[in-house]
Amino acid sequence: MYKLVLVRHGESEWNRENLFTGWTDVKLSEKGISEALEGGRVLKQNGYSFDIAFSSMLVRANDTLNIILRELGQSYIDVEKSWRLNERHYGALQGLNKAETAEKYGEDQVLMWRRSYDIPPMPLEESDKRHPIHDLRYKGIPKSELPSTECLKDTVARVIPYWTDKIAKAIIEGKRVIIAAHGNSLRALVKYLDNMSDDDILKLNIPTGIPLVYELDQDLRPIKHYYLGDEDKIKAAMESVANQGKKK
């Protein structure tokens, strides 16, 4: 049996302000730093240690991972970063308030943009300075692969090849793996691992900073999964994520 730990980054400054973030590089809030610290403590209390870590190219996930590894006394382990683990690109919604957007377009429309499988928001124009083609961290990636907007289906299409080529291979080699990423890149992976339907993924909410453990068989099929931490806090955190796209 293998174990895999997934962690969504702690609350970011834009999570706190209820803004669509996507590929915008936003720091952790004070609460997010505390969440990452608590995630590290819970992992340490439960005896977890790791051989390799994977993260995105975005600072909120990187900082969450660094805080967790410091808590574990494991800042020395290898960390591999990839744009393929970035948050889903929210296109022209990036920077907009979720509740205000729900007031304008309706809660149902915002829910579809946030949680549906195959409906992307309006795209960014390539001339927009927020477009990833203008970000130096992605200069080695073909422009055709950098998104102007994404639905979850698009996110799955970039996450799963990285899972297969890099992460799954590390697990099979016997390495203990932690992934620090984002709500939608982790939803993409969970959908694949659990073979979830397009409808069921709509209801999945992953809370910030709380370690999610997958126990996998020899073929990397899930045996079971569970969050580490206080059950009431976990439930409240999941409800908070679910309510982000509702009107004020």
Curated annotation (Swiss-Prot):
An example molecular function term from Gene Ontology annotations: phosphoglycerate mutase activity
Signal peptide (residue range): none
List of catalytic residues: 9 (tele-phosphohistidine intermediate), 87 (proton donor/acceptor)
UniProt keyword Isomerase, yes or no: yes
Annotated binding of substrate, by residue: 8-15, 21-22, 60, 87-90, 98, 114-115, 183-184
Annotated keywords: Gluconeogenesis, Glycolysis, Isomerase
SUPFAM superfamilies attached to this UniProt entry: Phosphoglycerate mutase-like
PROSITE patterns: PG_MUTASE
Domain of life according to the entry: Bacteria
Gene Ontology BP terms: gluconeogenesis; glycolytic process
Protein name as catalogued: 2,3-bisphosphoglycerate-dependent phosphoglycerate mutase
Species of the source: Borrelia hermsii (strain HS1 / DAH)
Gene designation per UniProt: gpmA
